[in-house]
């Protein structure tokens, strides 16, 4: 949904006719020192307390000076040096950019122009990447583990607001300093966010939500401010000029608000339920899609100026373009075309039958994102043929588990165990064909298992790459540790097992429900945590005795520095604190195991 900086609202709309509201040329009103920046030092504590960041949000920046409306795409471009190799794909030549960045896993969700030579791309994998024309050098940062759906670039170009969601009940908007990769503030919402835009020269952030209120306005510190005197409905687009704020709601209501007086200046009714509404022609026209038609509406009156038949519309125009530009599917399956009003390019097809999910314009090019996570640069020639260049696509490896090594680290990904040097450089494969998602280093190989139910524990030898089954768990595994040649396995619905790795035989089993984690600290003594009033317990393998330790908190995880020093997290729900506890075990007298316990770190929860 659209957002932009609008500089052509009339100075005194109440005294002018509706047809004169948008007669002034567009101007970009540079942001003064934003309230966001000035409030940051005063509100750093509250910002840090707020937790982590993302559909269609239009270009934030208008030209720095008055300029007539123009079209930035579908015009002949100056010749540039390109890679000679290419593959013709149904009327399109596909080449690859020199600087290649990884693809977005799960697909692209949003492309947003930040200036006439830079743009942001966001994906379902939580990655946000800034690309700079003409080499498209990427600057990438993962700001969330969930999907990014909306973005809005601040007029100072240093800050970006994003909406992140898991598609169910997690909805959060956060603002980031892109240059330092620091979060400035974040706010959770109970309903999904449908639009995101900076208004009033970047002083406020407008968040349109699918709630009864319809829109929430935040100041530079993330605090809610009152801007609308009445609920405008579900707001799909918000823009502002030097004095007025314009909002478009899905009900078709156009509302003008004087933000200095917080009063409604004018209300209009126009086409309702427009998808991806955006402003063009320096704010004079509102563009949106509905029912196989692209509508061009006069912003000052709400009147429909033009309708264009369209099979669908993924808009790619800029704020100053005089005509709408969009990508639509062609008649043939997996084929696409570029539209500029009634004009159309030759049909083209993307590799891998990719589906276009987002688009924007940079200089004379159209940048599109796909459901395969690949970005493409589209350029139309005089013959209407479209030249295609892939901007990313390197394969990424996602590690399911990582452990430190003497030099570098081991990690497990895509069924293989790798080693990466601390100095960087290429990683090397140690063991292939691994069936599991978790592992522990063990002597000349690794112990591998999966986090699911009834998992097999395998010993994978590094030199021979042979896999040998050690043990099969009967229920979900919550904790695994190695002591010498003994493997300690904790199953919450079964108990604690100790398995001889070399022989593949279980040598000890403590049957109990609610075990959380366990650690063998001597040849005979196991320290374990369990749910209940006495969460800390010692198990003696040789005698079979159990020693419960009174602890007025919940114990989470146990780890040992050596055979005597044990660490665990203690969660006190009454006091609202979490402590990292260190204690020295007196294994000759297990009943005095907590004779030396101290809190190393205390965290308030």
Swiss-Prot record:
Residues 46-57 have a biased composition (Low complexity). It comes from the Bacteria. Disulfide bonds: none annotated. It comes from Treponema pallidum (strain Nichols). This is Uncharacterized protein TP_0598. Residues 22-93 are annotated as: Disordered. Signal peptide: none annotated. InterPro entries: Haem_d1_sf, WD40/YVTN_repeat-like_dom_sf.
